[in-house]
């Protein structure tokens, strides 16, 4: 069923719902409040515990036509994916991609059948306990800018809009990576520019201004999801990412990336924020991205909301990070080593603090095939290291007081159809894409299905099935995880325990281990730490603890006075003697007291 957007401009929500009739039912008065909210620079739950969100994007399949620009063919496949993510990685969050092209196939017309499938598939993840962040996605503006024989493709804006724009024949010139189209393809640049400048187009439905139309479409999506997700499911919705990887397209005379972000992008987000409020999403933050090149380590343009002042709690600082030098294959020789990404992720923490808002890295990763794929194990390890702490492994034990907050993040990507696609690139039957992600030669999916339909990890489980502090009763002071993930057959160990802690050294031995230090707070609820499958769980802590029956969650007691510094060492080593464990605890207690 489809709705005409451009004829519906009511002054109040009740009028809108009356005009739309039964297609968008009234918002339920008893809808559950969000399970995760914003408090300063932290995500928190209803117990006041500091929450870390970790998971994956679902998925790059939305960029493809083969399954209707949805992450999954149906709810059954969504459940297969969600169960695999839970069981193989212990993740708690997904970033769920949305397609403008699929949602508005004709000017002013919303496809509620598509939105119904979105709600159903996202609801599967919510039912299994995942937090869900919806993402209004685009790359290179639209697939319809590209001719059937092009080397590249895009996703995002619908065909009718591109046709009305009358854009020039696309060409990237001498490009070795699809991302170069962003700044070198005149059609992509002009179309992107037109959106931000609200160009008025002549369409079959009359005159339509592009940015206004995007906002109207987005509001209809938000209204539909608010009305059609059950209260329990909606409670698991974190918020909205209004626009993936924003860029100006072209700058006006006298304009640069910083002024564009200040004068164009930020006002757009403020308008989107009001739209969320009017669509029943006032208690969810907008997860806003700065200009996409603000933190590039090769192509860099000033940004990161340098001129907005504090933006929390109604906004979250949402960014991506890809190691452009490592992906290039020529600007970084060899593999990543300890601390390669630490400064880049420290910069994200610094912007979070300056903006008084939490930070989340909603895309990161490295190609799993191709001529730089040999770097993936080390680069991805370095990125997770950067999420866990701002310090290198060599620095951590000696400078632990400056470890910084643990960052939330969703890796790109989780596509159960990896390597099993049948995508007609740019609708060309002679260019059927089957391998990898089936999109612009990318191959990032951490998961795939075998011939029996069972999901398996395409990366080392030690890297992806991680220890992380999912809910800390109080304030996290420091965290680190030595995953000892492998590059081929060789374990990468970047976190040596110092010789000044000999009993901790003996307890850890050559095993994987994590250390969490926190200052107590909250309402007495336990601190919850996610554990890898099959972990031996040798624990040295100053608080009582329990481990869940499935072995996947460590609960550290939240009882006692607030403001007390606590510690927990969690290792995969064979348990030492009681005396040795006590000696390790004494060392840790002295170390933590000296540091904090």
Kindly give the residue locations of the regions a language model identified.
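Extracellular glycoside hydrolase catalytic/binding regions
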Residues: 35, 74, 202-405
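Short capping micro-motif at the N-terminus of alpha-helices
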Residues: 53-54, 547-550, 556
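Active-site mouth of glycoside hydrolases
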Residues: 33, 38-39, 43-44, 50-53, ...
